[in-house]
Each structure stands twice: as C-alpha cells, then as structure tokens.
UniProtKB/Swiss-Prot annotation:
Origin: domain of life: Eukaryota
Name the UniProt record assigns to this protein: Proteasome subunit alpha type-8
Keywords tagged on the record: Differentiation, Nucleus, Proteasome, Spermatogenesis
Record note on quaternary structure: Component of the outer alpha-ring of the 20S proteasome core which is composed of 28 subunits that are arranged in four stacked rings, resulting in a barrel-shaped structure. The catalytic chamber with the active sites is on the inside of the barrel. Interacts with canonical subunits of the spermatoproteasome, including proteasome activators PSME4 (also called PA200) and PSME3 (also called PA28-gamma).
Keyword flag Nucleus: yes
Major localization class: nucleus
CC terms in the record's Gene Ontology section: cytosol; nucleoplasm; nucleus; proteasome core complex, alpha-subunit complex; spermatoproteasome complex
Spans through the membrane: none
InterPro entries: Ntn_hydrolases_N, Proteasome_alpha, Proteasome_alpha-type, Proteasome_asu_N, Proteasome_sua/b
Role played: Component of the spermatoproteasome, a proteasome specifically found in testis that promotes acetylation-dependent degradation of histones, thereby participating actively to the exchange of histones during spermatogenesis. The proteasome is a protein complex that degrades unneeded or damaged proteins by proteolysis, a chemical reaction that breaks peptide bonds. Required for 20S core proteasome assembly, essential for the degradation of meiotic proteins RAD51 and RPA1 at late prophase I and the progression of meiosis I during spermatogenesis.
Effect of deleting the gene: Knockout mice were obtained according to the expected Mendelian ratios and showed no obvious phenotypes with respect to viability and development; however males show infertility. PSMA8-null spermatocytes exhibit delayed M-phase entry and are finally arrested at this stage, resulting in male infertility.
Length: 250
C-alpha cells in the first residue's frame, strides 16, 4: 500500500503519512550521533566522528560549524544536504545584519532553517533535506540557547538533546544525568557532553568532535589532545568512584 504514496513528496497516504519525510528521518538515524548541552554560561556540542582515511584531511569532514559569530550548528544525516542548509543560513545571517544592523537571534536563524526544510516537504521536483540539526548560541541577553530541527521543518528548544544513530541511548543518559549540578560550571557541562557520547562511541576520545561557544566569544573547537585529556580525567574519576564503592561494600 505504501508504494502507491511514497513516490510523490506532496501526497499524503490514507493514514496521514508523508513517506518521503519519514524516509528523510530514517537517513538522519543512520548519521553520526550528535549531542548538545546548554550550560549556565556555555553551550557544548559533541559529535561522534567516523574514522577517516589515512591520507584524508580531517578538517574537511567536520559536523560542527559556525553560522555567525554567536551561532553554530551540529548536524546528523547527509553531509551534502547539510552543506546547502549551512550555506543558506550563513547568507541569511549576513543579510539580516546588513538589513537591520543587528545580528540574528538564535531562534530567528533556527526558524529560517526550519522554514527552508518545510518548503522542501511540499514542493514538486524537490525532496526533503535528510538532516537534523542542533543550533546553539547566545542572544543579546546573554542566555544560552539550544534548538533542534528535523527534516519535517519542526523546531523545539531544549536544555540538552541528541540526534543521529544512537540518539535514543544518549537522550536516556542525559535524562538521568542532566541536573543543575551537572552544568554548574563550564567544565562539568563539557564533561557531561563527553560522557554522553562515550555511551555510544567505542574507541574513546579519538572518535569525538567537540566544540563550545561562550557569550561574546567565537566557536572553539577542541583539539584531539584536549579531548583525550578530558576523557582520561573522566575515566580516572570513574575508577576512583568504583574503588570507593567497592570499599564501602566490603
């Protein structure tokens, strides 16, 4: 039955489904896991990094990028689709700044991206974008923001969220571990993001891409060495906690 309705983007199935949009959401579920955490004075983005070929330049396969000085984005899904969305969003950021002489708010650029995605769900000769995005940054009020969009064009604000292949596992971890204490300072928020990714990344820090953004500061990408140091500290704390637990039990 589905095959009669899954070819045209603009045709609903009898039970109310847009199959092409659902297929785009499946493409997202096959993408690298990405996590976003909104701290008190910081927003952290982390992405599961796939291993690259020995001769490939790692800088060309990043899943985290800046849209403007105060807004950045991580995505899961089709990289080529993301490139188009990122390019459109960057142009809109600059156009808005030239027109009204103020930078975009994080919600404004999120709504722009969501609207762009929605248009591609009801236009002939196009297909939906196969990406979900975590869009983060700071507005003039200094409050950190985190939004998530999906291929259907919806968007929501979050305290913490995950997208991609293992989003369900990471989200469950965040629901258990995201507390005010866990984001009380910048370092704890960074650790929480890494811990969440370590739930699904098997080979430790070398397969994690991490970035932070603070108020009035540009996006900061962590080097592989910095990530390894954070992972080592997390593992050391975990070992100490287990030793303390075993002593109490005896």
């Amino acid at each position: 039955m589905a095959s009669r309705y899954d070819r045209a983007i603009t045709v609903f199935s009898p039970d109310g489904h847009l199959f092409q949009v659902e297929y785009a959401q499946e493409a997202v579920k096959k993408g690298s896991t990405a996590v976003g955490i909104r701290g008190t004075n910081i927003v952290v983005l982390g992405v599961e990094k796939k291993s690259v070929a020995k001769l490939q330049d790692e800088r060309t396969v990043r899943k985290i990028c800046a849209l403007d000085d105060h807004v950045c984005m991580a995505f899961a899904g089709l990289t080529a689709d993301a490139r188009v969305v990122i390019s459109r969003a960057r142009v809109e950021c600059q156009s808005h700044k030239l027109t009204v002489e103020d930078p975009v708010t994080v919600e404004y650029i999120t709504r722009f991206i969501a609207t762009l995605k929605q248009k591609y769900t009801q236009s002939n000769g196009r297909r939906p974008f196969g990406i979900s995005a975590l869009i983060v940054g700071f507005d003039d009020d200094g409050i950190p923001r985190l939004y998530q969009t999906d291929p259907s064009g919806t968007y929501h604000a979050w305290k913490a969220n995950a997208i991609g292949r293992s989003a369900k596992t990471v989200r469950e971890f965040l629901e258990k571990n995201y507390t005010e204490d866990a984001i009380s300072n910048d370092k704890e928020a960074i650790k929480l993001a890494i811990k969440a990714l370590l739930e699904v990344v098997q080979s430790g820090g070398k397969n994690i891409e991490l970035a932070i953004i603070r108020r009035d500061q540009p996006l900061k990408m962590f080097s592989a060495k910095e990530i390894e140091l954070e992972v080592s500290e997390i593992e050391r704390e975990k070992d100490e906690a287990e030793k303390t637990k075993s002593k109490k039990s005896t």
